[in-house]
Amino acid sequence: MHHFSSRSAVMEAVVGYLHVRRLNEYRQLMSDIDSPDQMLTRAAIRTSVETAWKYVNLPSFIAYQELLGAARTDPALASAVDEVERDFEREFLKTVRAVFPHWKQVKSLKAAHELVQFVMQGMGVAHRSPQREQRARRVIDTVTDYLETIYLADTAS
């Protein structure tokens, strides 16, 4: 800690580091799923949902969730997290548009993104749930169904 002026400076550095790392990990994981020169298939949609599940099981995601929990009772940490959360949300949605070209013009893109994000985050923090992987597969199937429905409804001509 001797490299930092205070505990809050350490926490701000950790939050900032995880912010950049999480965005980069997401970009790397999702970058080759949706090819703009091919038709979007259910398999590609499912792969994106499965990859989102992998993402919320990465050590960086888990560490960040711990910080979010701690920020509930630590005002200085909450301040650092709030700032990063706003930026993360903007950057995350930009990344979604960049790595999923078929979804760029989908009217319900934000709703689809939020569905995946909140469901996967919820499953991610339920790491002690019995039969976690079997339950995750069922939820992945359901989320894939919804995303396919949203995509087909919003792109039907």
Predicted regions and their residues:
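Hydrophobic alpha-helical connector segments
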Residues: 13-16, 20, 24-59, 112-116
